[in-house]
């Protein structure tokens, strides 16, 4: 069992993402003291069952930062931004800093959500923060279930210390609400891979054209 904290600006799709996993949605518990919903998400691996207790902020990040109680004992994290809203990516370093102040040296995945939406404001090649901080990055679409399992698989491998760990069955997910243009998305991911071989920009503020 691992405590997974999910952070990012309001409206980036954190709750939608967590709620895709149906058993977690069915068994969630509300913790009024810190205003969070805790969803137990189960994944079945070749090494047995892994349960992530996903802490979802219940929207209180809209009132400024989150209390330390939200982060304490966090063993892994997902930082989410919305590829259709530039500001949510610009705020990623702040979320990362707040997280690392309380949780040192935990595995973190950066997720760019809503890649099913046509008009991206944050291009794949502009996403460089994960390279500076040595985080894993995935492009996801919560509403279409695209890449849903990837962040969990990465974190499970890190936490288990086993790069060969794999899921032996898919979790029960809510049916997709939207379809994703896979050809266009593969193009974005190719750009991402290409950008990964380029030197990082010098400035801290990620360049937007």
Swiss-Prot record:
Coiled-coil spans in chain: none
Q: Which InterPro entries match?
A: P-loop_NTPase, Ran_GTPase, Small_GTP-bd, Small_GTPase
Chain sites annotated for binding GTP: 9-16, 59, 113-116, 141-143
One Gene Ontology term of the molecular function aspect: GTP binding
Query: Where is this chain primarily localised?
Result: nucleus
What residue spans carry the region label Disordered? 187-209
| Keywords linked to the UniProt accession | GTP-binding, Nucleotide-binding, Nucleus, Protein transport, Transport
Q: Where is the composition biased (Low complexity)?
A: 187-196
Look up the record and report any one GO term of the cellular component aspect.
cytoplasm
An example Pfam family from this entry, by short name, is: Ras
Q: Locate the region Switch-II.
A: 59-75
Where located? Nucleus
**Could you state one GO biological process linked to this protein?**
protein import into nucleus
Q: Where is the Small GTPase Ran-type domain?
A: 1-162
Say yes or no: keyword RNA-binding present: no
Indicate the quaternary assembly.
Found in a nuclear export complex with RanGTP, exportin and pre-miRNA.
The family classification in the record reads: Belongs to the small GTPase superfamily. Ran family.
From the Swiss-Prot or TrEMBL record, give the protein name. Answer: GTP-binding nuclear protein Ran1A
Native organism: Lotus japonicus (Lotus corniculatus var. japonicus)
Q: Which gene is this protein's source?
A: RAN1A
């Amino acid at each position: 069992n691992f405590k997974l904290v999910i952070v990012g600006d309001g409206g980036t799709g954190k709750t939608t993402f967590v709620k895709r996993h149906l058993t977690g949605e069915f068994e969630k518990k509300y913790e009024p003291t810190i205003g969070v919903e805790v969803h137990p998400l189960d994944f079945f691996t070749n090494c047995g069952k892994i349960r992530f207790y996903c802490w979802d902020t219940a929207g209180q990040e809209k009132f400024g930062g989150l209390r330390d109680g939200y982060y304490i004992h966090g063993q892994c994290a997902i930082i989410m931004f919305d590829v259709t809203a530039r500001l949510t990516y610009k705020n990623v370093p702040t979320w990362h800093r707040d997280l690392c102040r309380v949780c040192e040296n935990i595995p973190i995945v950066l997720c760019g959500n809503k890649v099913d939406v046509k008009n991206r404001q944050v291009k794949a090649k502009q996403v460089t923060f994960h390279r500076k901080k040595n985080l894993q990055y995935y492009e996801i679409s919560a509403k279409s279930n695209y890449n849903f399992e990837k962040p969990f698989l990465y974190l499970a491998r890190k936490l288990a210390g086993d790069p060969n760990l794999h899921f032996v069955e898919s979790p029960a997910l809510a049916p997709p609400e939207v379809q994703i243009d896979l050809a266009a998305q593969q193009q974005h991911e190719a750009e991402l891979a290409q950008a990964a071989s380029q030197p990082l920009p010098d400035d801290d503020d990620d360049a937007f054209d």
